[in-house]
Design a protein with these regions (language model features):
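Conserved, well-ordered alpha-helix/loop/beta-strand core segments that scaffold catalytic motifs
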Residues: 342-348, 367-374, 381-386, 390, ...
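Hydrophobic membrane-insertion alpha-helices, especially the h-region
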Residues: 9-25
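Conserved SGNH/GDSL esterase-like catalytic core that processes O-acyl groups on lipids
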Residues: 103-254, 259, 264-364, 452-453
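Membrane/wall-proximal cationic-aromatic binding patches
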Residues: 46-96, 151-157, 163-173, 204, ...
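Solvent-exposed, polar/charged alpha-helical surfaces in well-ordered, non-transmembrane soluble domains
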Residues: 75, 79, 105, 109, ...
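Catalytic His-Asp segment of secreted/periplasmic serine-dependent ester chemistry enzymes
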Residues: 327-328, 389-475
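Alpha-helical scaffolding within the catalytic cores
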Residues: 69-83, 323-335, 364-372, 408, ...
Length: 475
């Protein structure tokens, strides 16, 4: 071979050997001008490439923030939650809309407890003026007079009386009303001796009847703190939300059973807020209104200057469609005051029927609801929770209602098409026939109607949802 090749090769090889022999003998030295590190050429050559620690940290965080595809829209919320965990300053708030599944602060109470234990916070959020399950709710003690007119998604006239963020409007009145159930017994057919029908029979039936009655005295509502996880034993920041006050409208406020203080209310349309925060925390507050005042009252918020808050907005029997009953300008006003970081929509059970195979009408209605929320609260992510498994009797035994998988698929589609996140509760429960396991569990996780959850079952769902909201993962 040509000598011109070997000569440079031998020189290079000799230099490498010389460095390998002499380098370990050179002592390490530090000075203000330069530093010499002790070198092990063989170890250096065999070692894996160094990775910048900052880049490595970011990479690890990226792995931790891996978000399931159907939950990608939660990324802004997850980032804010991560910041909240680091500095514990500022508020992070969730508007949790749902049907009877979350009545009495079920699911949301436990979710609030878990989030506040991890990220701070003190208070139950925005609470309505009256509630049909106020005695069942454990996270706040809630009492009120009988002379409030209640308007909701489920009551006609919400176009005349715009609803607030809670899904209700409450108006003080000089009267109240109550519902009673009128039952009619079955009447058998009457036949003559030849078998001819003399009088036709009638099946047993029942109907609801509303009775109106006069009430003397003012309209009032009282809230008290409770020492229950997910609730608050005392109130630190208190804000009243209302609209359509007159020039003479007032509210009288008593703290801890003390003397009443009268506050003038801002007249006019639009959502108004009155800050009633005490100088020091209180355990009880009573608000009193004139029964002839035209004011529309929406609710009272209990929170603090920092922490995570979950507002429970349950309306029994509501499908989730027709959210435009809350005017966009009202929703935008609540957003300015309360600054929601996430809207959760838990619906579907009230449109579910074993006979239905096409939910396109429901899809259209829910899409309109989501678009309405998005226009009123731009940039706020929305999480659609799919309908739970529910069972109906088929061939003598309970099985998953045949429409449930179809409804879940429809909800997944409408979430994707509206840019919303989607959590498949049916799948999280275990899928087909999982409700049967919830009913038969010990302790029981669901009621024997094979639709609703017990408190223990709701707590189980809250833990699953907590993982979804804090990790962005379904598994």
């Amino acid at each position: 071979m040509n000598k011109s090749f070997w000569r440079p090769f031998l020189i290079t090889a000799g230099a490498i050997v010389l460095v390998a022999v002499l380098a370990p003998l050179v002592p390490a030295r530090e000075s203000k001008v330069f530093s010499i590190k002790k070198l092990d050429p063989i170890k250096t050559l065999m070692a894996p490439p160094e990775v910048d620690s900052a880049a490595d940290s970011l990479s690890e965080k990226a792995k931790q923030m891996h978000i399931a595809s159907e939950l990608q829209q939660l990324e802004p919320f997850l980032q804010k939650l991560q910041q909240q965990g680091q500095n514990r300053s500022g508020n992070l708030r969730i508007a949790f809309f749902g049907d009877s599944i979350i009545e009495g602060d079920l699911l949301t109470g436990k979710l609030r407890e878990l989030l506040q234990a991890q990220y701070g916070g003190h208070g139950v959020g925005l609470v309505p003026i009256t509630s049909i399950v106020h005695g069942f709710r454990q996270t706040i003690r809630h009492e009120f007079s009988r002379n409030w007119e209640t308007v909701s998604f489920m009551k006609r006239g919400s176009d005349k009386y715009p609803l607030g963020m809670v899904g209700y409007t409450f108006i003080p009145r000089t009267w109240g009303y109550e519902e009673s159930v009128i039952e009619t017994e079955a009447i058998p057919e009457v036949l003559d001796s030849l078998g001819n029908v003399i009088s036709t029979g009638q099946e047993a039936s029942s109907r609801k009847e509303t009775r109106r009655f006069n009430v003397s005295g003012p309209a009032w509502v009282e809230y008290s703190g409770v020492k229950t996880t997910g609730g608050a034993s005392e109130f630190r920041r208190i804000r009243l939300f209302y609209s359509r006050a007159s020039a003479n409208s007032t509210v009288r406020v008593s703290l801890n059973g003390g003397e009443q203080t009268t506050y003038a209310l801002t007249p006019g349309e639009g959502v108004q807020m009155l800050d009633l925060s005490p100088a020091t925390p209180v355990t009880r507050i009573r608000l009193t209104f004139s029964p002839t005042d035209p004011i529309h009252v929406f609710g009272v918020s209990f929170d603090d200057l920092s922490g995570v808050y979950v507002d429970n907005f349950a309306v029994r029997g509501f499908s989730g469609m027709y959210f435009n009953a809350i005017p966009a300008e009202y929703m935008s006003a609540f957003q300015r005051y309360l600054d929601y970081d996430l809207v959760v929509l838990q619906y579907g059970g009230n449109v579910s029927s074993p006979k239905v195979r096409d939910y396109s009408r429901y899809k259209k209605g829910m899409t309109e609801s989501i678009r309405h929320i998005q226009s009123a609260m731009p940039g706020v992510p929305i999480l659609v929770i799919g309908v739970q498994d529910r069972s109906s009797k088929q061939n003598g035994s309970y099985q998953t209602s045949p429409d449930i998988p179809i409804l879940v698929q429809t909800q997944s589609q409408l979430a994707a098409e509206t840019g919303s996140a989607f959590w498949n509760l049916y799948e999280a429960m275990g899928g087909y026939n999982s409700m049967i396991g919830y009913v038969n569990a010990s302790p029981r996780l669901a009621a024997k109607d094979y639709t609703h959850f017990t408190r223990a079952g709701a707590d189980k769902l809250a833990r699953m949802l907590h993982k979804v909201l804090t990790t962005g993962k379904n598994d």
